[in-house]
Amino acid sequence: MTFKKVKDTRHKEQVAEKVKGKGQRDQGTRINAQDSVHACLISLLFLLVIYLADMKRVYLKKKIANRIANGHPWIFANEVQKVDDGVNAGDIIEVYFGNGKFAGKGYINPKSQIIVRLLTRNKEIEINEQFFIDRIAECWKYRKKTGYIENCRLVFGEADEMPQLIIDKFNDYFVIQTLALGIDLWKPAFVKAINQIFKPKGIYERNDVPVRELEGLSQQKGFLSEPFDTRIIINENGLKFNVDLENGQKTGYFLDQQDNRRAIQNIVKDADVIGAFTYTGTFEIHAAHYGARSVLGIDISENAIEQANQNAKLNGLQNIVRFETANAFDVLKQWSRDRRQCDVVMLDPPAFTKSRETIQKAITGYKEINLRGMKLLRPGGFLVTSSCTSLVSPELFLQIIDMAAKDARRKIRQVVFQTQSSDHPIIRGIENTQYLKFLIVEVQ
């Protein structure tokens, strides 16, 4: 009996030891797992601290306009109170208001008058390659929703929250402009995004624009893909147009007027039409396509007139529309003196100024050409006129047309007043996103 009790006792002790040992091993496993989690959290926290430490800050003055708080992405140098030491041109930085509140993240160029351009108002978003790929994908989603698929401005700078970035889509070909240092540094990301989303036939860089020099950048142009023939043909409103991506104005073609060119279809039928500042003849060829009796387009550039004639032949309209090389200001004045008349006058001049110092000259120029245009019209004729000068507001443009009508002793009735096509979206509060004014008036 005594032996049995001892045996039972030893058995219980052995079982207890096994249970205790297993518990210690399980506890050790849990401790090791917890240690691993803690180590990962510490590593992530350490990386976050490094990231935040590296993220330089810009502090704004306490008394500044509400423009930035209301959504404008530009911050001028005279609005800045302090910039952290060690900031380099092109760096991504955080911006804080004078009261300490977070304003946004963007890129900085201390040498520029516009010292910061904001990319996001969300502090949690990291500005990296994927950020821009996602943004461009969102831009494409918007264009598809609004019906701009074949040809469109895929990215319109500030309006698409990527300041100073322009990407135009011409069917399977793309043209990129990066007009500020901070956005130019991300050019490889834009090329990657286009390749991922579209599988394009070609990508071309048109950075041959003087504004880049204000950012310390050189003017340049060239292929961002395998080389291809930069002379392409696009379709617009049932017509075909040659586009020279390498040497054409801006990015090769004025996509912002594509809706406005369609707007003339009812007023040009059976009409004698004169177009000034014709460039490659897009408005004039639309007029011929929509049933005009005769169309004459004039432009000072011989190269533009040559392309316009090619476009007329491309669409089989060379017997209706013709083009001449001439100075529009001189010809309009002479024709009004000669009392030449037509049914429709179309004016699509380039920007007359990019500086507030010369805005009065621009006003005088717009008034002059519209006055002369009105004098060419038969009673009941139509004036089709545009301004792409961003410093001329829609209100000012209408005032100029009213002054021209008064001096021409004509009565006008508004038919259409609109802006650029919707692939160039307008953001309220960011005035430079609305730059194009397009007006049709009946003239008596």
Place the predicted regions along the sequence by residue.
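Non-catalytic accessory regions of SAM-dependent methyltransferases
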Residues: 52-169
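Conserved SAM-binding loop of SAM-dependent methyltransferases across substrates and taxa
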Residues: 280-292
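Conserved SAM-binding motif I beta-strand of class I
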Residues: 294-299
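Conserved class I S-adenosyl-L-methionine
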Residues: 270-277
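S-adenosyl-L-methionine
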Residues: 306-341
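Non-catalytic substrate-recognition/targeting regions of SAM-dependent transferases
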Residues: 157-162, 166-168, 184-254, 262
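C-terminal catalytic and target-recognition region of SAM-dependent MTase-like enzymes
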Residues: 368, 382-444
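Mobile active-site "lid"/loop adjacent to the S-adenosyl-L-methionine
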Residues: 342-372
